[in-house]
Regions:
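N-terminal beta1-alpha1 cap of cysteine-dependent amidohydrolase-like domains
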Residues: 1-88
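Short, glycine/charged-enriched secondary-structure capping and boundary segments
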Residues: 19-21, 50-53, 99-103, 133-136
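Short, conserved acidic/polar surface loops in the N-terminal third of protein domains
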Residues: 48, 78-80, 95-99, 130-131
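Short acidic (Asp/Glu) patches
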Residues: 68-73, 101-104, 108
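Phosphate-centric recognition/catalysis
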Residues: 91
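Class I SAM-dependent methyltransferase SAM-binding "motif I" and its flanking Rossmann-like core
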Residues: 96-98, 105-149
Length: 149
């Protein structure tokens, strides 16, 4: 059974990153000591390391460690072994392209179908439909397919 929280945004006016979601995330990820973060959407073009550090600061408030998928030698194994997964927002075209280039679209799909707790914000929620064809993001790259999870 799928165990997903899909949020249209990570930040609401006057609040810090994920602040409005943290109480729900503490419950959603209650059995997770660490969460695998997929920073591929890269809002504003920030680096994977910068984005991951930003997410670490937010999740530290609920005592959950964040590990960026880019920090692993094998992204497939990282997803398969993840206690929980978070895909952040940014550009959906870039995110989907990276998921295909790293050969993890189907691996991620299987993890979610098998109940791995998942959070997707913005682009990270866009990929949870059948296709990404409703996104209004700028097509800065062209993925090999618009098919998503």
């Amino acid at each position: 059974m799928k165990n997903l929280i899909l949020a249209s945004t990570s930040t609401i006016y006057g609040a810090s990153y994920l602040e409005y979601l943290l109480p729900d995330l503490a419950i959603h990820f209650k059995n997770c000591k660490s969460i695998l973060f997929l920073p591929y959407a890269r809002p504003g073009g920030i680096s994977h390391n910068e984005y991951t550090q930003f997410v670490r600061l937010a999740f530290a408030k609920i005592n959950i460690e964040i590990k960026g998928i880019h920090e692993f030698d094998n992204p497939i194994v990282a997803i398969e072994k993840a206690e929980g997964i978070f895909t952040g927002g940014g550009n959906t075209f870039l995110l989907v392209t990276q998921l295909y280039e790293n050969k993890i679209m189907s691996v991620l799909e299987n993890a979610l179908k098998n109940g791995t707790p998942y959070l997707g914000t913005s682009a990270g929620s866009n990929i949870c439909g059948l296709t990404m064809q409703t996104t209004n993001d700028m097509p800065i790259v062209y993925p090999p397919s618009f098919k998503t999870l």
